[in-house]
Swiss-Prot record:
Lineage: Archaea, Methanobacteriati, Methanobacteriota, Methanomada group, Methanococci
Organism: Methanococcus maripaludis (strain DSM 14266 / JCM 13030 / NBRC 101832 / S2 / LL)
InterPro entries: ATPase_NBD, Methan_mark_12
Name under which the protein is recorded: UPF0285 protein MMP0642
Membrane-spanning segments: none
Similarity-based family: Belongs to the UPF0285 family.
Domain of life (superkingdom): Archaea
Length: 325
């Protein structure tokens, strides 16, 4: 059995090829690169396309579907619209359309939004949207890798999304625009609200630069800003303050969910959550009274492949989310 998992991230598309539960290859295409190359042709360098049994696809916010759904039955790529979601490059759209127009079987993973009824109704009452589809994939990877039924997952990269899993189901969490900051994205504060009201900036533009990049003079685009900040942690006071502030913010978000999970298992993921120099996970551990573990860097793509494989093996539900395939 050969499956492919896709993570549609801020800085690019990551794909994992898995055969009989074993990861065979992982490759990444920058969003700007996708506009010049065919995703399927790049995938064909890793695996014969005719041998693929199923692809697990993540796309954008995933707020137009509430089940893991056969791509043939998904309208408008599974989203309500593309407004208010950060910087739009177009690479993910191209990849999605390539897959849908091929004859390769595929499923589309939804995001977590208030139409997903498997979550606690209080979180659905509080927030219209909690996470994009790849966060479900990351959670499933963590669930399968560590075997916990109860844990907190914090995915830290361009943005930070923290989710709570209880009894093997996603219970709720905090989206990128309401809680902790990431490198690029973060919640909108008073100054940004005033700038929006004064028509100096749109809400989406404010969100897209409300992360710790605002602390620095280091914006280098969606793909390279994190390297500029992280690699200068010991050399630039603003970069150090940015990372230290991110660690504080994420630690606060994780701790805010801790009372809901007596097992106190915490799993960190994402390019920043797994960053080793500076050692972000160690810095966060110092602020957390719990069992803190780190998931691999390509966790979203691998998780999407795990979802596809388990659906082929007959699973009708993933972390509480129903399957329509």
């Amino acid at each position: 059995m050969i499956v492919v998992g896709i993570d549609h991230g801020t800085s690019g598309i990551t794909a994992c090829v898995m055969e009989n539960k074993t990861v065979k290859s992982v490759f990444k295409m920058k969003r700007t690169e996708i506009n010049e190359k065919s995703f399927l042709k790049e995938l064909e360098k890793q695996v014969n396309l005719n041998d693929i049994d199923l692809i697990g696809v993540c796309y954008s916010m995933g707020d137009g579907i509430d089940k893991i759904t056969d791509i043939k039955r998904v309208e408008n790529r599974g989203v309500i619209n593309l407004e208010g979601i950060g910087k739009k490059i177009g690479g993910g759209t191209k990849v999605y359309d390539e897959i849908k127009s091929s004859n390769i079987p595929a499923i589309v993973i939804p995001g977590l939004h208030n139409g997903v009824k498997s979550m606690d109704k209080r979180f659905n009452a509080l927030f219209s949207h909690i996470a994009s589809p790849e966060k479900i994939s990351i959670c499933y990877n963590a669930y399968k890798t560590f075997g916990f039924e109860n844990f907190i997952l914090s995915d830290i990269s361009s943005n930070t999304v923290t989710l709570l899993i209880k009894d093997g189901k996603i219970f709720g969490g905090f989206d990128a625009c309401v809680g902790a900051v990431g490198i690029l994205h973060g919640p909108i504060d008073l100054e940004l609200i005033r700038n929006i009201d004064a028509d100096k900036i749109t809400a989406n533009e404010a969100f897209s630069k409300a992360g710790v990049v605002k602390v620095t003079d280091s914006y280098k685009g969606v793909e390279d800003t994190k390297f500029e900040i992280m690699n200068n942690y010991d050399k630039d006071e603003k970069c150090k303050l940015a990372v230290d502030s991110l660690v504080l913010s994420v630690s606060m978000e994780i701790n805010s969910l801790m009372f809901l999970t007596p097992d106190k298992n915490v799993i960190l993921a994402g390019s920043i959550g797994t960053w080793e120099n500076p050692n972000v996970s160690k810095m966060i551990k110092e602020n957390i009274d719990g069992n803190v573990l780190v998931l691999n860097r390509e966790s979203g793509a691998i998780g999407s492949a795990m979802i596809a494989e388990d659906i082929l093996n007959g699973k009708k539900e993933i972390l509480g989310i129903p399957v329509d395939f």
